Amino acid sequence: MASGFLWSSGFCGDDKGDEVAGLDLNLSTVAFYHFSNPYTLSNDPCPWSVFEEARSCKKRKKTPLADESIGSNGSLYGGGGSNRSTNSLSSLPTLQFRDHIWAYTQRYIAIEAMEEATLAMMGGDVNESKEERNGDGMKLVQQLIACAEAVACRDKTHASSLLLELRANALVFGTSFQRVASCFVQGLSDRLTLVQPLGAVGVVGIASKTVADTSEKDEALSLVYEICPQIQFGHFVANASILEAFEGESLVHVVDLGMTLGLPHGHQWRSLMHSLANRKGKPPSRLRITVVGNFPERLEEIEEELKQYAESLELNFKFEVVYKSLETLQAKDFNVEDGEAVVINSILQLHCVVKESRGALNSVLQRLHALSPKVFILVEQDSSHNGPFFLGRFMEALHYYSAIFDSLDAMLPKYDTRRAKIEQFFFAEEIKNIVSCEGPARVERHEKIDQWRRRMSRAGFQPMPIKMIMQAKQWLNKVQVCEGYTVMEEKGSLVLGWKSKPIIATSCWKCS
């Protein structure tokens, strides 16, 4: 099993079995890595190199060869222990991200060993083809990491050579990890073509993401909504929170940031209208939805659809559009009336406003705070794809999207074209943006829920605990997606995960 990749001293550190014991062996290997806790290995007696070659390749205009950076006892994972103690304080952030990669690889090897042991306990033989597959998977992980390092160091020769091998091994209809790797290969290839020579600053970004600008993206987005539970989960929790906020209110006003992500129908608002029309007591005297968006034709279609549905429910309904970007919004754009109960709904939108400077998002949040909403519903991807270092972002994204591709394995057959469309026209676009873009072009700046808590607090919001964990679990059982999805409560937020790996986090906020 890829023995050439093992360190001479065996597994380093003392994991005490707590991180590995609860892992589900059906999940792909990369999805098992516990990225948030690599520093448990800090007292490791094993030699460390912490990627000295890769760390200094920018200065030396050199990148380590594949066998040097990946092989056993090579400069990537072994040797050079003395360098660790003599590093300056300024190099500590680099060490942390390289430590992440080391920890990821160790987790991969540990899980492979567990898989073989489990097969043996079940009476199965680890045949040659299984060993070959494990070896191929290990090689693919090694190549991806080495290629990411080469791209980060702007070594086009080495990176191009690795990309040729990766394209042959990362198959669109292959295993879960082969498929996710194919998306990262596309991103690395795009980044490589745009990197500037050594000495230049940054990476030139490709065009900004547009909302459903092709028929393929339209179809992929609709398939994601129908098949994957992420968006529907966000809608369910958001609508439940909105209904609670509107209880007893007569004039109700929803401010929707992004309007259903560009979906062709107003799925979320049809459900809310039905619930409001049939709530206890009497329905509101008027429901007003103000949408922020820049795709007028689609919004006109959704407006007509929702108006017809409101008429069928005998619900007084008003639909308005603010044709602006989130960054240019002003409180006056929403024309809030006296006596209106306002809620703000943000489904997978605000991460696009996060920039290198903290001020951009904070300004938007403060202007939204001026609307004095009864509740602000925030639904975002629960992963750290906005770190300052490319390699750290790369590994976080690999971890996150490996879990998503694993879930697609459980939901759809191997050669189902719907799965290929979802992966290649939706999730691959997110991956490529995270991997290949910098500056304003990088809009998929997903962050963990803890970071969103800090951002919301700075803007003057305070958390409102979501007390509906049982309803969320019942909803998950009702939609019957497949086994493996989980709902967890975390500090008042609800998190949808795949085999306990967080995928989507929902939280509610009110004005302080």
Regions found by a protein language model. Give the residues of each.
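Long, compositionally biased intrinsically disordered terminal regions
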Residues: 1-512
